[in-house]
Amino acid sequence: MRSKYIVIEGLEGAGKTTARNVVVETLEQLGIRDMVFTREPGGTQLAEKLRSLVLDIKSVGDEVITDKAEVLMFYAARVQLVETVIKPALANGTWVIGDRHDLSTQAYQGGGRGIDQHMLATLRDAVLGDFRPDLTLYLDVTPEVGLKRARARGELDRIEQESFDFFNRTRARYLELAAQDKSIHTIDATQPLESVMDAIRTTVTNWVKELDA
């Protein structure tokens, strides 16, 4: 079986770390053990520096990061990760499990920020070509639930400090995109934890079995 790229998406506090652990456990039970893990923005030395610039509220002092500058920094970090880590790993037969990918930009910047969606799609295609995840697990949670969980973890980053309206727009765009793409599977992350974990296990198991069919 050819190696695959699985991405976990969702608002802050959706439970992406727990989901990643469940995905790994499920893949291992299915005999898949050669995996690497990525996060966006980040995952390479350069991409981590860009992560600090775009997320650390103190990194640029009083200077306001414009919406378009934010988008371009996300894409700079993304293409560096894709070209230097993800594609080489897949070519070597290693599965890649990612914490966020391009769907985040389409939802956060296209939905939350209200940036023109055609422009974002054009930029994505110019930077990434036809490269896409094989499977995306979107953990759907309301901003009220997600941000309560995120705030319980401690200090929030620059984007986590946005308004509920921002996150409602982001969630709406996530759901819209998920409805348009069969490779995106929506998981109700407001359920009890064990139910969420069971849904992830079932989704991943069925998907891998279909690959073997």
Curated annotation (Swiss-Prot):
Which gene is this protein's source?
tmk
Protein family (similarity comment): Belongs to the thymidylate kinase family.
Record bears the keyword ATP-binding: yes
**In which residues is ATP bound?**
G10, L11, E12, G13, A14, G15, K16, T17
Top-level division of the source organism's lineage: Bacteria
Q: Which sequence ranges are marked TM in the entry? A: none
Swiss-Prot/TrEMBL catalytic activity = dTMP + ATP = dTDP + ADP
What EC number(s) does the entry state? 2.7.4.9
Q: What does this protein do?
A: Phosphorylation of dTMP to form dTDP in both de novo and salvage pathways of dTTP synthesis.
What Pfam families does the record point to? Thymidylate_kin
Presence of the UniProt keyword Nucleotide-binding in the record: yes
Kindly give the Gene3D superfamilies that the UniProt entry links to this protein: P-loop containing nucleotide triphosphate hydrolases
Molecular function terms from GO:
ATP binding; dTMP kinase activity
* Protein name from the UniProt record: Thymidylate kinase
Q: Which GO terms describe its cellular component?
A: cytosol
The record's listing under InterPro entries reads: P-loop_NTPase (IPR027417), Thymidylate_kin-like_dom (IPR039430), Thymidylate_kin_CS (IPR018095), Thymidylate_kinase (IPR018094)
Provide the GO biological process annotations: dTDP biosynthetic process; dTTP biosynthetic process; dUDP biosynthetic process
Q: Which keywords annotate this record?
A: ATP-binding, Kinase, Nucleotide biosynthesis, Nucleotide-binding, Transferase
The organism of origin for this protein: Escherichia coli (strain SMS-3-5 / SECEC)
